């Protein structure tokens, strides 16, 4: 039996509720979330995000990559096209304590992973989330310096603490425009 079977069973129950119908393409909360793919870091759980509230991108470390920038640019352009006069959204970059990408700081782990994948060790080391507040600041700065993002897109940075369950704001949206 597939390991996905229990989730497919849950899908049948979800589909029977009908809550998925009639939803607007534009997110209700005007927030775009970028966070880690760690299963302990689910925005539906720690932020109470519900269906159609916010687009969510999850990757290793919740890091800003070229692919993430392009996805945000696409959603921004789509939002501006669909609602030319409406406000755009805030991108919330959320890193967390105890991130598994911290293993990339270990030379032996990084070297083995680089050998296995062909990825550059220096680039891998830069992806390690050891100090989530520092990496959030770096990723917010990277987003703000991107020429492909619409200037009306606000960016903020946050750290989710796995021990306390609390999210702390590291970069306020108002700071990015100062």
Give the label of every model feature segment.
Residues 1-27, 62-64, 70, 74-88, ...:
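Divalent-metal-activated hydrolytic enzyme cores
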Residues 34-36, 58, 92-96, 158-161:
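Short beta-strand segments
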